[in-house]
């Protein structure tokens, strides 16, 4: 039995339909579905095909193939022949220089405008149009046009990189509108503020006029790392720093007004993103920033020498002050992150519907980076209950860690000179010998340096030596001889206000242990 398949009968369905050759009376014909014209006589280098009627006759002498006739006379300046002394190359370069590229712009498939979208269309139209315009210039149009085209392609490469970074990374789909908000509400961190006094520049913490971003009723928004010094009624005073970028006349000024601004802006950004016109809104917002004029409400000067935080300059306050000077950006980010929990409560309690809409919409579309930006924006102006940024957290940590403080590691010795006790002629602060934590003193008593303690306590006055009186409570004015911090009745002298013009150098000295010299609080 054969295994070959059974032959099928050819029908109209299984028959391969091949085009038939058709000849036309005019001489043309269709061969294999292609229309061919009749050849009119032999060409140079090609032998003529014999006619059908001539095939039965004997072939005559083969005709030679005609060749092109060599021209007579000069050989240069002819098609295919060079000019003498490299004239052909020179004239070619001359023609390339004299013919502007703009008369025949052809970007081809690599045209940057083919891959543009949103704001990129505007940028690529400007760069490519500039390249075409440069090509119209005679003599230098060709090289300038080529360089401009290369520049346009380079800009397009940068745009592709930005589009990839902001569109393909999870949760990092930024819009121009939020970038515009960041440029308005959080000014870039500056390095140091300086003031010019008779041609001499001094480093100061007072904000310059260029550091002021926005002024409202009783509040000033500024760059981080400085504090506004406002002149009112012929006197200059430092304003209270509510946040690293927001200062108020006093700590009781509510920040509701500036927070409503943020609420409105975030709500507008959310609406633009939901309507897929975020880039258009951002472009309009950025352009409006260039033409918006905000009148000055206050006169900011630089003769206060403000501290970055008001009040007594403690060690932790001093450390935060130095951090603000060293890295204003890091201090700004840390302070805003620490305020996010309180900002969440204020958003809900204050009914900030624009911020709530943004926090509800952006997680649904997976833009978690925008959620963080909105929280940082609101935390940057959430200073209603904030008096010192980072100072509260630092003071709380200091109170807890002070229980375990072992005191100074240096073995000190107290010396009694004319009734006053001093520390062995070192630069250590006298109070450091008594800064041993309570728990550390209980469990590490053998390591606690208690030299001179009995003598110290013996010089303290008993309670019956104090004055008895009645009436309102007032501040005592102890004499210099009564300044004994080791006694239980020690009362420090009240802090006074020192004008900045009378302070030469820093307000505190850095010895082996920081010693606070004074502060220039001017309220």
Swiss-Prot record:
UniProt site (Cleavage): 177-178, 191-192, 383-384
Interaction with EIF2AK2/PKR, as annotated region: 2-58
Keywords: Acetylation, Apoptosis, Capsid protein, Clathrin-mediated endocytosis of virus by host, Fusion of virus membrane with host endosomal membrane, Fusion of virus membrane with host membrane, Glycoprotein, Host cytoplasm, Host endoplasmic reticulum, Host lipid droplet, Host membrane, Host mitochondrion, Host nucleus, Host-virus interaction, Inhibition of host innate immune response by virus, Interferon antiviral system evasion, Membrane, Oncogene, Phosphoprotein, Ribonucleoprotein, RNA-binding, Transmembrane, Transmembrane helix, Ubl conjugation, Viral attachment to host cell, Viral envelope protein, Viral immunoevasion, Viral nucleoprotein, Viral penetration into host cytoplasm, Virion, Virus endocytosis by host, Virus entry into host cell
Region (Disordered): 2-75
Any one annotated GO CC term: membrane
Transmembrane intervals: 169-189, 359-379
Segments of this protein annotated with the region CD81-binding 1: 480-493
Chain residue ranges for the region called Interaction with APOA2: 122-173
Stretches of the chain found on the membrane's Cytoplasmic side: 2-168
Region (Important for lipid droplets localization): 164-167
Residue ranges listed under propeptide: 178-191
Chain span(s) of sequence motif Nuclear localization signal: 5-13, 38-43, 58-64, 66-71
Basic residues bias: start-end ranges: 7-16, 58-68
Protein name: Genome polyprotein
């Amino acid at each position: 039995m054969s295994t070959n398949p059974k032959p099928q009968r050819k029908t109209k369905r299984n028959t391969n339909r091949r085009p038939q050759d058709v000849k036309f009376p005019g001489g043309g014909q269709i061969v294999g579905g292609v229309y061919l014209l009749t050849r009119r006589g032999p060409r140079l280098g090609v032998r003529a095909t014999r006619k059908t009627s001539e095939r039965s006759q004997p072939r005559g002498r083969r005709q030679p193939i005609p060749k092109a006739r060599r021209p007579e006379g000069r050989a240069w300046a002819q098609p295919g022949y060079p000019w003498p002394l490299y004239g052909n190359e020179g004239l070619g370069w001359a023609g390339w220089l004299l013919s502007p590229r703009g008369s025949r712009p052809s970007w081809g498939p690599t045209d940057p405008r083919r891959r543009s979208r949103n704001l990129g269309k505007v940028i690529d139209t400007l760069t490519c149009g500039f390249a075409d315009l440069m090509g119209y210039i005679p003599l230098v149009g060709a090289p300038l046009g080529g360089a401009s085209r290369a520049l346009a392609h380079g800009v397009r490469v940068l745009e592709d990189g930005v589009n990839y970074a902001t569109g393909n990374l999870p949760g990092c789909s930024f819009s121009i509108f939020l970038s515009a908000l960041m440029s308005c509400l959080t000014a870039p961190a500056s390095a140091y503020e300086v003031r010019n006094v008779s041609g001499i520049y001094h480093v100061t913490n007072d904000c310059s006029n260029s550091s002021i971003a926005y002024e409202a009723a009783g509040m000033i928004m500024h760059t981080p790392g400085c504090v506004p010094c406002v002149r009112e009624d012929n006197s200059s005073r430092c304003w209270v720093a509510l946040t690293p970028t927001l200062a108020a006349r006093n700590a009781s000024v509510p920040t509701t007004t500036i927070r409503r601004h943020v609420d409105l802006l975030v709500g507008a950004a959310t609406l633009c993103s939901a309507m897929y016109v975020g880039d258009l809104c951002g472009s309009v917002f950025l352009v409006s920033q260039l033409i918006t004029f905000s009148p000055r409400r206050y006169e900011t000067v630089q003769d206060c020498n403000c501290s970055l935080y008001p009040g007594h300059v403690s060690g932790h306050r001093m450390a935060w002050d130095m951090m603000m000077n060293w890295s204003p950006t890091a201090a700004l980010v840390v302070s805003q992150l620490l305020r996010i929990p309180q900002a969440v409560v204020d958003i809900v309690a204050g009914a900030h519907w624009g911020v709530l809409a943004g926090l509800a919409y952006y997680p649904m579309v997976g833009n978690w980076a925008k959620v963080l930006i909105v929280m940082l924006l609101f935390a940057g102006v959430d200073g209603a209950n904030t008096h010192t940024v980072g100072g509260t957290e630092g003071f709380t940590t200091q109170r807890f860690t002070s229980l375990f403080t072992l005191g100074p590691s240096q073995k000190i010795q107290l010396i009694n000179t004319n009734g006053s006790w001093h520390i062995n002629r070192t630069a250590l602060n006298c109070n450091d010998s008594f800064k041993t934590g309570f728990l550390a003193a209980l469990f590490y008593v053998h390591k606690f340096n208690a030299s001179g303690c009995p003598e110290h306590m013996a010089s303290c006055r008993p309670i019956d030596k104090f004055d008895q009186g009645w009436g309102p409570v007032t501040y005592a004015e102890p004499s210099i001889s009564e300044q004994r911090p080791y006694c239980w009745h020690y009362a420090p002298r009240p802090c006074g206000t020192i004008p900045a013009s009378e302070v030469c150098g820093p307000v505190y000295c850095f010895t082996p242990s920081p010693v606070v010299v004074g502060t220039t609080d001017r309220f």
